[in-house]
Every structure is written in structure tokens, then in C-alpha cells.
Amino acid sequence: LVAESQSKFVGAFFGFSVEDPYPEIDLDAVPECFRPCIELERVASGCWLLQAIAILPQYRGKGLARQLLGKAESVAKDSGTNRIALQVEEVNEVAFKTYQSNGYVEVDRRPYVHFPGSEDTGDVVLMWKELN
């Protein structure tokens, strides 16, 4: 789904339902940089996983991310699940606080493993929210 402001595309999100039970994956066959996310996805089996949410920089701070988050929660609920999950890097403080203020709680975390060319540090955090 997308967010619009004055008929302009300004943001979007996408996600999917995580299989339950989670499929068996040989982590040794997976590049190391992907392992933390796969391990956390396994913890989120049965959830609807918000894989990405983004707002163009010039439109941030206007409540659009919260609106998109609400739409994602509706999509998750309509899919038949009672929980929405997401992964966020702990260094992304703005996103982390936005999720917390919208009822998401930390469930698990894994140390971030660098992608080639990345200098990110810290943990990847799995958060989720119960949907009523």
C-alpha cells in the first residue's frame, strides 16, 4: 500500500504472512548477513510480518508513517492473523520509538551482521503487536 499527499506518492509498506510452522532452513547455506533476519522471522511464525515501511524524507514528521502503520495493521488483521510483527535496527531510534508508542513490544533480538559495504552496528530487534 502507498501513502499519498496532495496526489503524490510519498511512502509505502509491504509485508506477508509468515508460515506456521516455519519451513526448515539450513542456515549454514544462507549468507551470514541474512541469518539474523531469518532467525527472527522464525520467531514470528504465524504473524503478519511488516517487511518494510518508508516515507520520503521531505514528508516525514507529518504522521504519515503512523497512518501507514495503521493500514498495515488492518491488512494483517484482514489476513486472519492476530499479531503483526516487524524487524527494526536498534540504531533507528525514530522508528523504534514510533513502534513502541504504537503498542509494539520487543520480543527478541540478534546481533546485526554487516552486509558488504554496510557500516551498521547494534542489534536487529523483533517487535510485535497483538491485534484485537
Q: PLM features: residue spans?
A:
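Conserved beta-strand in the GNAT
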Residues: 2, 8-17, 49, 54
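A short, internal acetyl-CoA/4′-phosphopantetheine-binding micro-motif in the GNAT/acyltransferase core
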Residues: 4, 32-33, 53-60, 89
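Active-site beta-strand termini and strand-to-loop segments that position acidic
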Residues: 4-6, 129-130
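Conserved acyl-donor/pantetheine-binding loop and adjacent beta-alpha core of acyl/acetyltransferases
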Residues: 17-52
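C-terminal "cap" of GNAT-fold acetyltransferases
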Residues: 32, 82-85, 89-96, 101-103, ...
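Conserved GNAT acetyl-CoA-binding A-motif
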Residues: 46-48, 60, 69, 76-87
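Conserved acetyl-CoA-binding loop-helix of GNAT-fold acetyltransferases
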Residues: 55, 61-74, 78, 97-101
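Conserved S-adenosyl-L-methionine
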Residues: 108-109
